[in-house]
């Protein structure tokens, strides 16, 4: 039986692509383990899936000054030792890393054990963890073709982003019933990220009188951001977040307004949903969402509404443009084959 160790954590975005790949390896009877941090989100997600989980010490990698920067390099070194010992016991044939600060000790520990390491980079430019890890990797899978210019060419394989199978299996009728929506008006799903986005939430709610004339709205507004005064508004459903219902909601969705995190937008792309993308500004991030969104716009999958330009008038304008040019967007979206991503990654894992 072949063995694989997965790693990646710190945010859900460093875990969900692993969850897209794991079921296919389980079908092929791989022995699967996961190495992550002691208290990261990856621990909760992976243990819920029933996959053996091993925790190690890890320090956060920061690009800015923080007193914790003095302590954290020692935690990383301890994490390398923890990972080295654990990998030596597990004896995997291959390690697959999705990035995040916890992945660095695992990648180095794998390399020290002479285990082939495969990385996946979701964004246009590598994050700090993958920048460190890539020198220890034998192959690097990239979500965006443009990412290749930032990485060692001899290691790069373009795959796109692996998408969870359950996301593709939504039921439109169940979605309509869950939302209480009719079939008469198109549905817009609006997502501001797991924590929500104050400016997006406020603008959407201010634009409701105009938007609800032509559309039905699903608003995933983030934890603590519900507006009780709108709970019974016809044609408008708001949720802090959804779990099992998301595939059915996406099956109902005609258009998406969203942040531009790589995993989410590739799910919309695979489902062929035209998008208005509102990337996090450079003030709130390293600018990766802006690059992601602009790439999608160049390929005809989406239009980009920059954070600083978000207001009621611009939001309505972008929604109308999306609606009027729906067929143009759909034609572009059909060119992408999302199923190839998992197929290519599985093939390379098997050959490692």
Curated annotation (Swiss-Prot):
Regions crossing the membrane: none
GO terms assigned for molecular function: glycosyltransferase activity; UDP-N-acetyl-D-glucosamine:N-acetylmuramoyl-L-alanyl-D-glutamyl-meso-2,6-diaminopimelyl-D-alanyl-D-alanine-diphosphoundecaprenol 4-beta-N-acetylglucosaminlytransferase activity; undecaprenyldiphospho-muramoylpentapeptide beta-N-acetylglucosaminyltransferase activity
Residues that coordinate or bind UDP-N-acetyl-alpha-D-glucosamine: 11-13, 164, 194, 289
One cellular component term from this protein's GO annotations in UniProt: plasma membrane
Reaction(s) this enzyme catalyzes, per UniProt: di-trans,octa-cis-undecaprenyl diphospho-N-acetyl-alpha-D-muramoyl-L-alanyl-D-glutamyl-meso-2,6-diaminopimeloyl-D-alanyl-D-alanine + UDP-N-acetyl-alpha-D-glucosamine = di-trans,octa-cis-undecaprenyl diphospho-[N-acetyl-alpha-D-glucosaminyl-(1->4)]-N-acetyl-alpha-D-muramoyl-L-alanyl-D-glutamyl-meso-2,6-diaminopimeloyl-D-alanyl-D-alanine + UDP + H(+)
GO terms classed as biological process: carbohydrate metabolic process; cell division; cell wall organization; lipid glycosylation; peptidoglycan biosynthetic process; regulation of cell shape
Amino-acid biosynthesis recorded as keyword: no
Topology relative to the membrane: Peripheral membrane protein
Record function comment: Cell wall formation. Catalyzes the transfer of a GlcNAc subunit on undecaprenyl-pyrophosphoryl-MurNAc-pentapeptide (lipid intermediate I) to form undecaprenyl-pyrophosphoryl-MurNAc-(pentapeptide)GlcNAc (lipid intermediate II).
Protein name (Swiss-Prot/TrEMBL): UDP-N-acetylglucosamine--N-acetylmuramyl-(pentapeptide) pyrophosphoryl-undecaprenol N-acetylglucosamine transferase 2
Annotated source species: Bacillus cereus (strain ATCC 14579 / DSM 31 / CCUG 7414 / JCM 2152 / NBRC 15305 / NCIMB 9373 / NCTC 2599 / NRRL B-3711)
């Amino acid at each position: 039986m072949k063995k694989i160790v997965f790693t990646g954590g710190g945010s859900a975005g460093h875990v969900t692509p692993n969850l897209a790949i794991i079921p296919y390896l389980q079908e092929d009877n791989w022995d699967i383990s996961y190495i992550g941090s002691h208290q990261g989100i990856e621990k909760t997600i992976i243990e819920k899936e029933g996959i053996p989980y091993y925790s190690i010490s890890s320090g956060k990698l920061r690009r800015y000054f923080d007193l914790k920067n003095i302590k954290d390099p020692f935690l990383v070194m301890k994490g390398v030792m923890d990972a080295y010992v654990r990998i030596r016991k597990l004896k995997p044939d291959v390690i697959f890393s999705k990035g995040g600060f916890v992945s660095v000790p695992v990648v180095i520990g794998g390399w020290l054990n002479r285990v082939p390491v495969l990385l996946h980079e979701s964004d246009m430019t590598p994050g700090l963890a993958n920048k460190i890890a890539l020198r220890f990797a034998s192959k690097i899978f990239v979500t965006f073709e443009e990412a290749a210019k930032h990485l060692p060419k001899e290691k790069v394989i373009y795959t796109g982003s692996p998408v969870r199978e359950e996301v593709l299996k939504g039921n439109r009728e169940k979605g309509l019933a869950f939302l209480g929506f009719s079939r008469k008006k198109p549905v817009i799903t609006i997502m501001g990220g797991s924590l929500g986005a104050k400016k997006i939430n406020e603008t959407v709610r201010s634009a409701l009188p105009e938007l609800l004339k032509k559309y039905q709205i699903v608003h995933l507004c983030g934890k603590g951001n519900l507006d009780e005064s709108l709970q019974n508004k016809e044609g408008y459903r708001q949720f802090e977040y959804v779990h099992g219902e998301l595939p059915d909601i996406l099956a109902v969705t005609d258009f998406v307004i969203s942040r531009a995190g790589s995993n989410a937008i590739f799910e919309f792309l695979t489902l062929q949903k035209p998008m208005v993308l509102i990337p996090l500004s450079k003030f709130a991030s390293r600018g990766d969402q802006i690059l992601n969104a602009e790439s999608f716009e160049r390929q005809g999958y989406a239009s980009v509404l920059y954070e600083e330009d978000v207001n009621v008038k611009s939001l309505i304008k972008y929604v109308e443009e999306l609606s009027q040019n729906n067929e143009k967007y759909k034609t572009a979206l059909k060119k992408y084959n999302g199923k190839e991503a998992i197929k290519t990654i599985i093939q390379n894992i098997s050959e490692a």
